[in-house]
Swiss-Prot record:
It is found in: Cell junction, Focal adhesion; Cytoplasm, Cytoskeleton, Stress fiber; Cytoplasm. This is Dixin. GO terms for molecular function: actin binding; gamma-tubulin binding; mitogen-activated protein kinase kinase kinase binding; protein domain specific binding. GO terms for biological process: canonical Wnt signaling pathway; cell proliferation in forebrain; cerebellar cortex development; cerebral cortex cell migration; cerebral cortex radially oriented cell migration; forebrain ventricular zone progenitor cell division; modification of postsynaptic actin cytoskeleton; negative regulation of neuron differentiation. The coiled-coil domain mediates interaction with MAP3K4 and inhibition of AXIN1-mediated JNK activation through MAP3K4. Residues 127-300 are annotated as: Actin-binding. Residues 211-228 have a biased composition (Low complexity).
Amino acid sequence: MLACLTRGNLLDVLQEGFNEQQLQAYVAWVNAQLKKRPSVKPVQDLRQDLRDGVILAYLIEIVAGEKLSGVQLSPSNQQEMKSNVERVLQFVASKNIRMHQTSAKDIVEGNLKSIMRLVLALAAHFKPGSSRTVSQGRDSRTSVQSHQPHCATAVAQGAAAALADVCHDVSRSGRDVFRYRQRNASVDEEIENPYWSVRALVQQYEGQQRSPSESSCSSLTSPSPIHSAKSESIITQSEEKADFVIIPSEGIENRTDETGSPLSRDWRPGSPGTYLEATWEEQLLEQQEHLEKEMEEAKKMISGLQALLLNGSLPEDEQERPVALCEPGVNPEEQLIIIRSRLDQSMEENQDLKKELLKCKQEARNLQGIKDALQQRLTQQDTSVLQLKQELLRANMDKDELHNQNVDLQRKLDERNRLLGEYKKDLGQKDRLLQQQQAKLEDALRKLSDASYQQVDLERELEQKDVLLAHRVKGDTDEVTNYNSHSSQRNGFVLPVAGRAATTATHRGPQSSDLQLVRDALRSLRNSFSGHDPQHHTIDSLEQGISSLIERLHVIETQKKQERKVRGRSPRNQASSEYRASWPPNSTLPHSQSSPAVSNTCTKVLYFTDRSLTPFMVNIPKRLGEVTLKDFKAAIDREGSHRYHFKALDPEFGTVKEEVFHDDDAIPGWEGKIVAWVEDHREN
């Protein structure tokens, strides 16, 4: 039915010259589709009836089989009408149908060109079959099948007439294309010309000649079996193509957009003078390929017509029945011509078969090469698969090893975390101990301040003792002087002075007790400080001062003894010895750093304690090698439990610290003296 509304002058269609007959054809096609929905009213005017979009929605539902949602069946204003048309255009765009210069506003305003373009786009895309076309094809097939050939001459005449008409139409198409190219200078319109395709020409010719042949029984419609066998498909194809090939510019635009042809991509309806961007060489190549395909099809058609002309049947029918070389009642010349034609036909068929055989052999070689290549590729892939399996195995082994390492590291991490927790606990304990020590340090500082006051008091008492000692020394000197004068008066006889000795001992007894009291006070003061307190140095200085005073007394007594050597042992010397014996064993030069009157029979001892940075020195009245640990303990006079280390020379290791445990063990010496370290065993 669309073929009717597209038949007209092509130039008028391109120039938008729509006549009343074409409009009626559009209306008739739309109404023919709307008949499938009896409830829908037929269309009278395309401008008014399709502008609301409802008829278009029904048309899409009929031709496409899809119902549009959201369509207002009774639009009351322009906005609802525009919404319906926009939904129709969205559906068309979803089907990849390109609608150039078509908008919902144009259709709502009644633009006839846009409405016709949309109708043709739907017809070109969905291709609904016309009932009349189907009925015509059915009637033509029935008539053709019922028509049987009469003789070979009639067949030949029909074929000759058909070929002549085809050649005439081809020449017409060439002239029409040339004239149209000169007028419009456009190539894509040439492709859309109704006389472009040879198949279309033959089909058009057969379609045009079929109706008069039915009435006049013309010989142009060949009643041969090949025509009856192929006409069915040819007629159907021609009728389907007739609906869409011969269409105006709107149909051209939609169909070429659907197929994706580059020749009509830039074409716009209403502008026939627009040129394409593609070059003429590409266009000519496409035309040449198209013509080659059409010529191949025409050649096959002519070959079939020739076989039908010579044999009166299809080539496959010839294989089923024997071929008669001589037919009775036929002119020998005609028979010879027919035989030669058959021979030529057989040779051509032989050549075609040879070509097909060579083609099959080439394809077989190609397939064999592809097979070999695939086999080689398969071998390579097998090798690659084996390598991948080996790599996978190695990767799994590495993974297991890494897992084991991870487990080991996790175990070590747990152990470290446990140790860290213990260290944190120890650190907390050390912090608490540090706080306790700080508290003790504050207490010791407080005691130190108290001790400083006690030290001042002791220094004051010491000064008093020094003054008292000086007075007593002066009194002793006076007594010695008086004694000497008295002895000279006695003419050298020494009288018993037991009473004086007793008096001297009586005077020195309190002096010895006072000295012991001072030493006890210093010892208690030293114990009140920590091991590294700087106040120990002050206490050591005080103790050294007291030792110096005692040393001076000892020097004075020594001088007195030397003066009395010539007189023998007098009661005064005996009293002095008794006074010396009344001192404690460790009072002999205690904690002195200098000893000006040390003889060879004494051993100098230098020792360090953990409570003082200053070393102490004492003299022991024994030779080096004879001094024992008991003598050393008696000399330093330290209370409590201690450990004693002495500097010694080892033949194997050199200079070492040797610890002595037993009191009877001899103490090693170092360069003529003894160097010792005294450590408090309770602190360790």
